[in-house]
Amino acid sequence: MSVDDLVVVGAARQPGFGEIDVAAAARELVAGLVAEPWGQASASIYETGRLVSLAPWLSGHAARVRFLLAAQRPDGGWGAPDGYALVPTLSVTEALAAELRREAPGFERDSLAGVVDRGLGLLRSWLNDERLPSLPDMPAVELIAPALISMINGYLGENGEWLNLPAGMDGAKLSAVRARLASGAAVPQKLVHALEVAGEAAVAAPGVSPSPIGTAGSLSSATATIGASPAAGAAWLGAGEAPEPGAPVRRYLEAVVDSYGGAVPCALPITVFERGWALSWLRRAGIPVAVPSGLIEDLCDALGPEGSPAGPGLPSDADTTSVALYALALLGAVREPDCLWLYETGTHFCTWRGEEGESPTVNAHVLDAFGEYLRHVPGPAPRYEAAVDRLTAWLRDHQRVEGSWQDRWHASPYYATACCTLALEDFGGKDSADAVDRAVRWVLATQREDGSWGRWEGTAEETAYALHILLLTTAASGERPMEAVKRGYHYLRSSVSDQGVPVVMPPLWHDKDLYLPVAPVRATILGALYLAQGALPLRGE
């Protein structure tokens, strides 16, 4: 690779004693974006359960069952705390019940039955005894939960038992989706990601077309995905006889399974999402990193009239599009963000058209894209300038009383608060100074005794978001809270390897299940380490 093939950003700084060579780690991360063009995301308990149930013919079946058995919590459930556990617990309980009913389950029957019974016991407590924690705003939960409960009730009904639906759910939306699919009509692309909820209507549904994967690296167009989802792909293929090995959707499933060793993520490929987030976090922190020109060209090529989806099989969305545009601008490849106007509503920008709900982080990312574009545009751009004013006001109005933001795409308020605070700091003007100060005060007030930050416990990811807020904003006093930064840096340094890889990386991002996008999170952590190393008065502090 020649010098002309690279775009170098940032200025080099030599690491001191005890520090991580962040620039070297960033180079390795960027190389991984090229080497793994589908992206890297954590395995999903929910999605893996669906493959156990829907595709016992798929290679790696026994490994998937073992993955699920090992992940059961002491209380009988699966997944993260609070209401996040409902969907994975339903998925695994149904999957292992289906495994028990097979003639040759391949596992010790009494042990498997005990695992299922513990899962059912917790589900009865949640759903029939009304002890279910409040449910988070997760994609398709209003379809997934009724579908899985109906399947489990099919087993329980033989003994005169059943599980109730969560409060506020009646299954009407699920019935409508299934009826539409059965009619042969096309369905919105965002629903295809959760096609498995449709049951028999999903099998070879005429209104659903596989999406070829062939635009990145050497990937073959003979590989195709259904909604970028292994579960959706398995549902479309059906649970009967195994399809031909060369069938494009089966090729996709086999490729994912082979890459992960059995268990599967909720979504793959996530090419544009991963690259946009990772590169923008690295660049915003000022890390010196060489970005191959081909990577930049791929991001440019991904942007069409409607923007870009996170990956093949998913709908285009304002979040992926705005982050890609922002990353490109930071890398010197400025594009007019006019495709984002498609997502403008009367008050804000939606993730996709027809969205039920609203997202502060999506609007913060649109503000980043518009604001960075205005820094480069040679003349007046009144429409963009007016949108920046509206977005900053909208974000300020959605700040919580204590100074944080919450969002529908991440479990942690530290992610949402970092996105919104940094956008307002950079592009919100003087009118946003108070909102930024309130966010900083909230971050300082919620630091844990060990120097970390986190919703349920301290994590490297959430600590990194907090450090970005403290180090990339200017307090009203003009001073930075360096004692909090020092404590946060000590925690972060002790939580990662010498290459800046977190020892523990819990999934905190919202999809059908919580997931971890590896490269974006690692980029955020590297950015925080780099900023802290530059700000602390003594190397190694």
Which functions belong to the PLM regions below?
Residues 29-33, 68, 119, 123, ...:
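Buried hydrophobic core positions in alpha-solenoid tandem helical repeats
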Residues 73-78:
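Nucleic acid-processing catalytic cores of prokaryotic defense/repair systems
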Residues 32-34, 214-220, 506-507:
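Short Pro/Gly-enriched beta-strand edge/turn motifs at strand-loop
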Residues 192-217:
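Edge strands and adjacent loops of beta-rich recognition modules
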Residues 1-21, 36-63, 80-110, 125-193, ...:
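An alpha-helical repeat/solenoid feature that recognizes helix-turn-helix modules
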Residues 22-27, 335, 343:
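Helix-turn-helix repeat elements of alpha-solenoid scaffolds
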